Amino acid sequence: MRRDASAPDYVAASIGSTPSARATSNRMSPAGVSMFYGSANVATVLAEISAHDPRPYAAVAAFELIRPVTVVDLAVTPAMPSLFDPDRMSLNALVEFIRSFSEDLSRPVARDGREHLAYAPTQVLTEYFRCLSPLSVDGITFRSTHNGGINYVLFTGPEGCVDPGGETPQAILRLKPGSERVLPR
């Protein structure tokens, strides 16, 4: 990446999901598992990148969905059912788990070489949704630990991020041409 390039000529493979061989431990994915991390808000993307990358700039681009996806929304948690509603009382434990887990997702984790331990609970739940859930889940939405914005993680590696005209059966996201930018942080 060149520092002076305000509109670089990136391709989906170079700015989408990190290849598995280079994928480090992240909030939702263990080292070696590639996933697409994004946000609809550039400020949130910059806040997330700034937390672990010391460079004074960041490369960003817009992607669009090629097909509908199903995501588990942990960014907006349900209200606790009333203790006086016998029809919904059985949901209390589940709702409390979702609310507690969502709060855990929003806690900062120190990048001290032991982050893989702090990330383990969220990675386990992500792997459940990705591989074992009877639901057909493509990703998760969650709140940024850095600015409260909405983040998305989609369960796809570089093969799921394509350039216009490069659509494949595995593709989920298409790079919007001309949207690539290098921004100061």
Report residues per predicted region.
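Short active-site loop/helix that positions an aromatic residue
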Residues: 42-53
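Conserved structured core elements
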Residues: 39-43, 119
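Active-site and NAD+-binding cores of ADP-ribose-processing enzymes
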Residues: 1-29, 52-185
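A short, exposed loop/beta-hairpin motif centered on an aromatic-Gly-Thr core
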Residues: 32-38
